[in-house]
Amino acid sequence: REGFSGMARWMQKQSAEEIGHAYAIAEYMIKREATPKVDKVDVVPQGWGNPVEVFEHALEHEKHVSKLIDELVQVASEEKDNATQNFLWQFVREQVEEEANVLNIVSRLRKAGDSAILFIDAKLGERES
């Protein structure tokens, strides 16, 4: 809505990736004779003051997801469920990358300030996957 089409494209790609992760987890659960259940999803804010705030929010969310995955690994470990631990480690590694990517964007946006935000927008719009 604010004209940052590159950032919007980046977020759309990110969203599609996260949906893929949800499907992977559901498929794994079915293989293990568990029933996937989607509960209510927290309401996402509908507006921010500027793009930095958007990506700061995304960074906090990635940290939250990392914590949840870590907790699942811990439960699997306590249950001596090696298969699930192995499955979850891919997400542990993924979260390290996710947090680093978003932190990098936040850092760049903070350093660039308003004068270079359109350049960063264009760069984010180049994301392929």
Residue ranges and their predicted role:
Residues R1-S129:
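Iron-associated oxidoreductase/ferritin-like identity signal
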